[in-house]
Swiss-Prot record:
This is 3-hydroxydecanoyl-[acyl-carrier-protein] dehydratase. GO terms for cellular component: cytoplasm. The keyword Cytoplasm applies. Necessary for the introduction of cis unsaturation into fatty acids. Catalyzes the dehydration of (3R)-3-hydroxydecanoyl-ACP to E-(2)-decenoyl-ACP and then its isomerization to Z-(3)-decenoyl-ACP. Can catalyze the dehydratase reaction for beta-hydroxyacyl-ACPs with saturated chain lengths up to 16:0, being most active on intermediate chain length. It comes from Cronobacter sakazakii (strain ATCC BAA-894) (Enterobacter sakazakii). It holds the Pfam family FabA. Pathway: Lipid metabolism; fatty acid biosynthesis. Disulfide bonds: none annotated. Homodimer.
Length: 172
């Protein structure tokens, strides 16, 4: 049985990356440097824009983060793909929180819009995931819309984020 808390600390997220949070068969978050959040501040089975589940997580920004040194030299900005990946990470994390088992894989996204950027001067990135549907049959899959905010201002939106959990990824 999964301990369905409403919030998770950085240590909890790191435990997920080691396969210790959702059991031996539960999905894992990536380890640092690809773990794109410091904490999950809210998880619910209802709520969100569609009343089918909601996740909110945060990433503290500091100018020494690895991506600022290489993307781009003289023009540091967090790659937009990392914000997108964070949203996929949270969809998979939610599926594990619901008790889903398997290895998480991003399956696609409907549309992504970038209307801002994360600079080294930012303080905090907030991710909000609004679930539209969870399929829990032979295939476990989450479908959600997401948004990324920097210091309270929305800068990315994504529709139809899809993540599946797979028992066997050898033919993926």
């Amino acid at each position: 049985m999964v301990d369905k808390r409403e919030s998770y600390t950085k240590e909890d997220l790191l435990a997920s990356g080691r396969g210790e949070l959702f059991g031996a068969n539960g999905p894992q978050l990536p380890a640092p440097n690809m773990l794109m959040m410091d904490r999950v501040v809210k998880m619910t089975e209802t709520g969100g824009n569609f009343d089918k589940g909601y996740v909110e997580a945060e990433l503290d920004i500091n100018p020494d983060m690895w991506f600022f040194g290489c993307h781009f030299i003289g023009d540091p900005v967090m790659p937009g793909c990392l914000g997108l990946d964070a949203m996929w990470q949270l969809v998979g994390f939610y599926l594990g929180w619901l008790g889903g088992e398997g290895k998480g894989r991003a399956l696609g996204v409907g549309e992504v819009k970038f209307t801002g950027q994360v600079l080294p001067s930012a303080k905090k990135v907030t991710y909000r995931i609004h679930f539209k549907r969870v399929v829990n049959r032979r295939l476990v899959m989450g479908i959600a819309d997401g948004e990324v905010l920097v210091d309270g201002k929305q800068i990315y939106t994504a529709t139809d984020l899809k993540v599946g959990l797979f028992q066997d990824t050898s033919a993926f």
